[in-house]
């Protein structure tokens, strides 16, 4: 399920409960010199091995992101076309599940697209049951989308 995030607004991961959660705040200002400002905190499993943002994937030379050394994906990144994507876990879905795919793959799949609209359309058909539950933000200088592995997402 996906929803377009409205114009001049800040959006946050709304499912921040009492357990450790990643947080992202996005300020979209279409037409501004800095159309997207992002603040993020990755606090799920702080001891999990990772490397700082870089071009870690030879098959995705246009992607800059931190890399999760356990599963090989990322929690947040951007591509040379200006698409940014980040994943947020949901309540009761902390950590990996050996029977499911890594949510970090979804961010990389979003960054395979030249704009946020194409990414959101491509990912809207994902089978959420293949992953632990998540919220995904995909944005560029024109659009921003919130995709969820569960149910309907209200527009921001």
PLM features per residue range, with description:
Residues 1-20:
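N-terminal amphipathic/basic-hydrophobic helices that include classical n-h-c signal peptides
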Residues 16-156:
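N-terminal nucleophile
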